[in-house]
């Protein structure tokens, strides 16, 4: 619990940084943060005690990572369907043994109820830890200029993407397997939906003494191969064809990796197509009907809005404005936030199914991206409730 709270504070802090103070500085290739504004915060930290406290918290979190290691994909105790230990593997989150079958196969779906046995396969946790650790370490390096944070971040990236004994092949062929039914699904791509956060971190680390040109080249090659897999594989095409939040996060992944790999034409096409996606996902009143079908409808609505916030933020990097795009019948990201805010503030009772508790974490992160982009009075007047 303490780790999750600290991570939430870190994420909020880093997003807030991207909306404050501007100075002239060489801008690295960042996709979710505005480096010039972040550099302004670093400069202000010399005299601003509040910023100093936030940086101290960031540094504390980074210090806790220095002695940690992530679990390699080769360390899992289960054989992958293809037999290659370097392949990523995970089980479908909401699938459970069928109690009516002697062997429990095939597994059956219980939407919104996560099977804890899935944690026995550690690849998802390993990748998730990689993203969290590299993101934290890279920003600690930037704000403190302490090379030890960069060195640790680069070592983790080598461990996951480069070292022949421990690397992961750049694909998700066997993600979110349904036991007794398949060997992996496109829907499993959602496992790595927070990669865009780490790409900002990698770009920061590229300026460090710890990352060699060979390291940077190999890491970029890994992501270039992963991007090709996302666009051409059976699983990638399946996820591309989805309609709900999976589609939005798929496009966010493709766009961020394309920008990271210098393929702006690919990213621009994603952002252009997002206008059609917006028309298909949102209703004119702001509802996201495909998310409202879920057993945790509030959570999935918030989750999808976060994807839209990330996608819109990245679109700015190529001078495209999704924040203010509106279809002829009024569908827009703005309407999406306006719809959910009264429920988030408990001004209205949630009208759809929500079997889990209402948690504002995802919505809070989505709203932070909207600062300076959208005018949401309910948020501006109640910001403390989302901190």
What are these regions (language model features)?
Residues 232-238, 242, 257, 261-266:
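Noncatalytic carbohydrate-binding groove/subsite architecture in carbohydrate-active enzymes
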Residues 1-26:
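Bacterial Sec-dependent N-terminal signal peptides
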Residues 249-351:
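Long, repeat-rich segments with strong aromatic
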Residues 25-239, 248, 272, 316-317, ...:
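Extracellular glycan-targeting catalytic surfaces
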